[in-house]
UniProtKB/Swiss-Prot annotation:
Compartments it resides in: Mitochondrion
Cellular-component GO terms for this entry: mitochondrion
Region (Disordered): 26-67, 92-114, 585-609
Record-linked Pfam families: PPR (PF01535)
Taxonomic path: Eukaryota, Fungi, Dikarya, Ascomycota, Saccharomycotina
Key words of the record: Mitochondrion, mRNA processing, mRNA splicing, Repeat, Transit peptide
Domain of life: Eukaryota
Transit peptide region: 1-63
Organism annotation: Candida dubliniensis (strain CD36 / ATCC MYA-646 / CBS 7987 / NCPF 3949 / NRRL Y-17841)
PPR repeat boundaries on the chain: 274-308, 309-344, 347-381, 382-417, 418-452, 631-661
Function (record text): Regulates mitochondrial small subunit maturation by controlling 15S rRNA 5'-end processing. Localizes to the 5' precursor of the 15S rRNA in a position that is subsequently occupied by mS47 in the mature yeast mtSSU. Uses structure and sequence-specific RNA recognition, binding to a single-stranded region of the precursor and specifically recognizing bases -6 to -1. The exchange of Ccm1 for mS47 is coupled to the irreversible removal of precursor rRNA that is accompanied by conformational changes of the mitoribosomal proteins uS5m and mS26.
Subunit structure: Binds to mitochondrial small subunit 15S rRNA.
Listed name of the protein: Mitochondrial 15S rRNA processing factor CCM1
């Protein structure tokens, strides 16, 4: 490189040599060969510059001469450099080549110009020996600071000690596995260089404390082996480091929990357990889902007069919410935090977790009270909390008008909606039956390649909640807000369904004219998903929404087709029974003619709303790889459809299959409480089904056969009682009322009439 220096108004040129790769325009130039002269020097006389270069003949002799004059320390550094390069090439190169995050696009070596090896060698030797001098010294950029490793260990590692740099000062985006491998390399080199022998405990602890906890988890066996080789006992701070690394993550396995218990026993042998030890111990039990062991730990703390800290309360609350799913105990612990002392006052994170738990258990009013309490205390709210409140309010008839208000508060804070917020927008619009807005929001997700399974499920849910305009009595929730009106209008105007994205089969219209539009588009979308994303279709909640579309839009033929094509009975665990089917010839020929005519009309109507590609796929696919196994909720929908469309044959078919489902492994895997709840729900829908068909005696027989098992109430028996009154069956109506009274007293603790009279007589008023 040539630089121009002005001094005493006389310009002069100074050469600065550097190693660089020229551009392709310079690669075809022939390299000029300089005749051998004296060793490198530069003489400036009258503006003339003379520069000498070492030739190939003199290179060997000069290298030997320089190396003989080098001090011993520099020779050691050169040796370490060669060793360092060799070790790095063996350990890191193969993994970096296979790692997509760290591999860079390498240029073709055939296109690179030849590099002056002589000049590069001179520069390296000059930098090490300090003999290289330039007329203008330019300080090189400082390297990133290395880890503060103790000097004793740094001497054993040599140049390998510079392999790792702190995460905050490192500009490289190495994956976590690569960093862990680097630490393995470092520990391996230290083990070969003498290990931990001769090092003080303080030096060893300082070195191991530099390992990030997320990487330490996989290095614990190596470290324990190094202590064993050095015949040293592991001090309790190192054991605690092991425990902290093992408690990372959402869940802790039983094997990891055994190690944690073992390490805590070793710690207790060396020192008394402190508050931070108990905090970590309780956190580990929570993540291992053993909340019953926490009471024993708290009792042990009480005997040692150790006060329960805020962190312990926080871990217990989160354990009840996310691991035990015990909402009431979570609320009790949360209230204890608020009223116990000032030190244990819950922060915004605990408030957020409890609010989420309230929304999960449909206690929207309690969630809103906690939200306003949080704001009154001056705590910060976040985007996820607001979007979760919006989703919870949309489920409540009382607070559903506030749903969009919480979402628009996100924009008021200046936050950009994240993926969770966008999914909750889809959910609120879908639950409200606003198919047009849901389609537009999903179209936006297609444009940004951010479609998730949850978003797709909400799109199908919107079709199942659709109500034709002439039947809808309420306005869409988003239209009750001025900001919502502008938001909806802008979204719909910004979407052009005539331009499909990724082949997604939206019909080319932003307006939904009638129910046939919904049936046709949902069928086309299902066919597209079968071909492109079949893994989406194995979710029972998604299939339930897809089947409900035909149920809500009064199309039994389409409902039965979707029920059979999108779900199947999982026969795992069902005992095989030999069945004999007797088919009797039908004698009513006119009935067959009418049936054939009805089937022809039905097929013509179905051809409009059913995707032809889906029909072809169903004919060619015989297995259940694109179907979801049926659960109790799907059987409830099926028996409800049989009663709504008054199809006795389909009801008998579902009733028989539901009995087989109860013998399957999927039903037996449920808890006894859940099994009882599912059976009671199906029995309630069965009573409603027989009542809709005017089979009141059959409906009453279902109630009478399970009077000792199920807590029948007016919620399930009201339909049967009203139907009996309309048909003039007063005896049946009286019997139904007696069943309701008996079960309410037995299962709900309602006071009997005679007991109430006795109570009033004793009270005197």
């Amino acid at each position: 490189m040539i630089r121009l220096i002005r001094g005493n108004n006389v310009p002069s040129l100074v050469f600065k040599r550097s190693l660089f790769v020229p551009s392709n325009s310079l690669t075809n130039k022939r390299k000029r060969r300089i005749p051998p002269l004296k060793p490198r020097s530069s003489n400036k006389e009258g503006g003339d510059i003379k520069q000498s270069r070492i030739t190939d003949r003199n290179q060997t002799s000069r290298t030997v001469g320089v190396s003989e004059k080098l001090p011993t320390q520099i020779k050691k550094e050169l040796k370490d450099l060669r060793s360092f390069t060799k070790v790095i090439a063996q350990h890191l190169k193969p993994e970096q080549e296979n790692d997509s995050l760290t591999s860079a696009e390498k240029p073709d070596t055939s296109q690179l110009p030849p590099i002056d090896i002589e000049e590069a060698t001179d520069d390296i030797f000059g930098q090490i020996s300090g003999t290289k001098k330039s007329s203008v010294e330019v300080a090189p950029p400082p390297p990133p600071p290395g880890l503060d490793i103790p000097d004793e260990i740094k001497e054993r590692l040599g140049l390998l000690s510079e392999l790792l740099v702190p995460e905050k000062s490192s500009n490289s985006k190495l994956p976590e596995k690569q960093v862990e491998n680097n630490w393995k390399l470092l520990l391996s080199q230290l083990d070969q260089a003498g290990g931990l022998s001769g090092l003080s405990k303080r030096t060893i602890s300082k070195f191991f404390s530099k390992i990030p906890p997320k990487n330490l988890k996989g290095l614990i066996p190596i470290i324990e082996n190094m202590y064993n080789k050095a015949e040293m006992s592991i001090p309790h701070p190192i054991y605690y480091m092991f425990v902290r690394s093992l408690t990372l993550g959402d869940k802790i396995s039983d094997t990891q929990m055994q190690l944690i218990d073992k390490y805590f026993q070793e710690i207790s042998k060396q020192t008394d357990l402190k508050i931070d030890h108990y905090e970590t111990m309780i956190l580990a039990q929570v993540k291992n889902n053993h909340m019953e062991k926490i009471d024993g730990i708290l009792a042990l703390m009480k005997t040692k007069n150790i006060e329960i800290s805020k962190m312990i309360y926080t871990s217990i609350v989160r354990g009840y919410i996310f691991y035990q799913k015990d909402h009431q105990k979570a609320l009790e612990t949360f209230d204890s935090m608020k009223f116990l002392s000032q030190k244990t006052q819950p922060d915004e994170k605990v408030y957020t977790d409890v609010i989420v738990s309230c929304i999960m258990h449909r206690e929207i009013e309690k969630a809103l009270d906690l939200y306003y309490e949080l704001k009154d205390k001056g705590m910060n709210v976040n985007q996820n909390l607001l979007s979760t409140l919006a989703k919870g309010c949309s489920r409540s008839k009382q607070f559903k008008t506030q749903a969009w208000n919480f979402l628009f508060q996100i924009y008021d804070h200046g936050w950009v909606p994240n993926l969770q917020t966008y999914e909750h927008m889809l959910y609120i619009a879908a639950r409200d039956g606003d198919v047009e807005l849901t389609r537009a929001l999903f179209y936006k997700m297609l444009q940004t390649n951010s479609v998730t399974v949850r978003a797709f499920r909400y799109l199908i849910l919107s079709y199942s909640k659709y109500v034709p305009p002439h039947k809808r009595k309420e306005r869409y929730l988003i239209l009750l807000n001025h900001k919502g009106q502008l938001f909806r209008e802008n979204i719909l105007q910004d979407v052009d369904f005539s331009k499909p994205i990724h082949g997604f089969p939206f019909l080319p219209s932003s307006h939904i004219p009638d129910s046939k539009f919904v049936l046709a588009e949902s069928s086309a979308i299902w066919a597209h998903t079968v071909m492109n994303n079949p893994s989406f279709l194995r979710q029972q909640t998604l299939v339930a929404s897809y089947v409900s579309i035909a149920l809500e839009l009064d199309d039994f033929t389409e409902f039965k087709n979707r029920f059979n094509s999108a779900s199947y009975l999982n026969k795992d665990g069902i005992p095989k029974v030999r069945e004999i089917e007797i088919i009797e010839p039908q004698q009513d020929e006119p009935t067959e003619t009418v049936t054939a005519t009805e089937q022809q009309n039905t097929s013509s109507n179905t051809s409009v709303i059913r995707s032809p590609i889906l029909n072809q796929l169903q004919q060619n696919i015989n297995d259940n790889q694109f179907k979801a196994p049926r659960d109790s909720y799907l059987y409830n929908l099926a028996i409800k459809a049989a009663g709504k469309f008054k199809n006795y044959g389909f009801a008998q078919e579902i009733l028989h299959e539901r009995g087989q489902f109860r013998k399957s492994n999927s039903f037996k895997s449920l808890s006894p409480k859940q099994q009882h709840q599912d059976d009671f729900q199906f029995a309630g829908y069965l009573v409603e089904c027989w009542t809709n068909m005017n089979l009141l005696e059959d409906a009453y027989a279902v109630v009478l056969s399970s009077i000792d098992r199920f807590p029948w109430s007016w919620r399930e028996l009201g339909v049967l009682n009203n139907a009996a009154m309309k048909l003039g069956s007063l005896e049946l109506a009286e019997a139904v009322r007696k069943v309701a009274q008996v079960t309410q007293v037995k299962h709900h603790g309602k006071i009997k009439r005679q007991d109430f009279k006795t109570y009033v007589m004793k009270r005197g008023y």
